[in-house]
Regions:
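Active-site histidine-anchored catalytic micro-motif
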Residues: 2-108
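Conformational coupling and interaction surfaces
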Residues: 75-76, 80-188
Length: 188
């Protein structure tokens, strides 16, 4: 969906509907919502149904390192949505850029482990090889030489592996127009 026009107007989407539907189900199991891009769907769901805040935990791949912040792809796609979510009481496990960039993989490993996995594996690997030859790829922060950063993978990893990771609980900042973090004292 397009970015929120402001911090009070939701953008209708199938993703927002799904989040609301799942969060409002009567179920004793915890609900984790993994967000591998902008927070538009989650913010829209919250603006439409604020009761979801106490019924899920969001795991978001996005934002720059603390305490300063700065430009980052997922955050930059919808700053208003980040401020809606950070201004809510919703639990958020944020995985910022300095953490998700720690998931590099070599082209050789992708060729060994992904390419042999049938038509889909071959397609994914071939697409990556073709993209790696473009000028955009050579300028990408997600590629360094013969390796790529698989930045979205920490989200499922947080759920699949035992919780033996190091983390910090910090007050949610307000995100400014230049994507830096500001402590305003109003967020949780």
């Amino acid at each position: 969906p397009p970015a929120l026009p402001d911090a009070a107007t939701p953008v209708p989407s199938e993703g927002a509907k799904l989040i609301i539907r799942e969060a409002m189900k009567e179920d004793t199991r915890p609900l984790f919502v993994l967000l591998l891009g902008p927070l538009t769907d989650l913010a829209s769901a919250y603006l439409q149904e604020p009761r979801i805040a106490g019924r899920l935990t969001a795991i978001w791949i996005g934002g720059a390192p603390y305490p300063v912040g700065g430009p980052e792809f997922n955050l930059g796609n919808d700053v208003n949505a980040v401020n809606v979510v950070f201004g809510s009481t919703m639990p958020v496990w944020q995985v910022p850029k300095n953490v998700y960039e720690m998931m590099p993989v070599s082209m050789a490993e992708l060729e060994y482990r992904v390419r042999p996995q049938g038509a889909v594996g071959r397609y994914l690997f071939d697409q990556l090889v073709a993209y790696s030859q473009t000028p955009e790829s050579r300028a990408s922060a997600f590629r360094t030489g013969e390796s790529w950063v698989l930045g979205d993978n920490p989200a499922p990893g947080l759920l699949l592996y035992e919780h033996r990771f190091q983390f910090d609980w910090v007050p949610a900042p307000y995100v400014t127009a230049d994507q830096t973090y500001a402590a305003i004292g109003r967020n949780r």
